[in-house]
Design a protein with these regions (language model features):
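Short amphipathic alpha-helix that is part of the acyltransferase structural core
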Residues: 1-38
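Conserved N-terminal entry element of GNAT/NAT acetyltransferase domains
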Residues: 1-14, 159-192
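A short helix-loop-beta-strand connector motif used in the catalytic cores of GNAT acetyltransferases and
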Residues: 45-56
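Conserved beta-strand in the GNAT
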Residues: 57, 63-73
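A conserved beta-turn-beta hairpin within the catalytic core of GNAT-like acetyltransferases
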Residues: 74-85, 148
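A short, internal acetyl-CoA/4′-phosphopantetheine-binding micro-motif in the GNAT/acyltransferase core
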Residues: 86-98
């Protein structure tokens, strides 16, 4: 059996051109501000130089199929670190794969490893900021993380290829059943 660790590798500076090509595709699908390639290069360098960025990719050099970027950062009110996902993306030709699941597992593994190294928990914060296929993405993240801990709302944003969603993400029947089976009374109160 192939493991997550063997499929997801850390990107290297030699992957930059290919990663940038994928970023252009990703931005065309879901970017909501103008793409600044020089700014992208700054964040890629943080990952390539191991200075607070982690860029995991699936695929050999020249054949990258999926990628995830997590940033070691902190909230404005603390010096305690956490991992923040900047993107988790699978090339359109490979969307019927399990790559998104493998990337999420990779990010969780990074959080676990950094927690051990730091001697305290390094939380992983992942979310969905998109106008396309939101319902499916929310369901995927719920399977890995459980109950959401927040939500984003936007004003004056034009999403490319936006798809309306009528689904109420907070009241999914399957999640209600899961909650009844697996959560404590306090967790159920917080979710309602």
């Amino acid at each position: 059996m192939t493991t997550t660790k063997s499929l997801v590798r850390l990107a290297h500076s030699s992957d930059e051109a290919e990663v940038l090509a994928h970023i252009r595709i990703m931005h065309a699908e879901s970017g909501w501000r103008e793409l600044d390639i020089d700014r992208c290069r700054i964040f890629l360098a943080r990952a390539f130089d191991r200075k607070g960025g982690i860029l995991g990719v699936i695929g050999a050099p020249g054949h990258i199929r999926a990628m995830i970027y997590v940033l070691i950062t902190n909230a404005w009110y603390t010096s305690d670190h956490h991992l923040e996902e900047l993107f988790c993306w699978v090339h359109p030709d490979h969307r019927n794969s399990d790559y998104s699941k493998l990337l999420i597992e990779f990010a969780k593994d990074c959080s676990d490893r950094i927690s051990v190294e730091m001697g305290s928990k390094c939380p992983l914060i992942m979310g969905i900021l998109t106008g396309k296929r939101m319902a499916a993405k929310v369901r995927l993240y719920r399977r890995f993380f459980g109950i959401p801990v927040g939500a984003y709302f936007a004003h004056n944003v034009c999403w490319p290829q936006a798809e309306p969603s009528e689904e109420d993400f907070w009241r999914l029947p399957s999640m209600a059943k899961w909650l009844r089976r697996h959560s404590t009374g306090n967790e159920r109160k917080m979710a309602s």
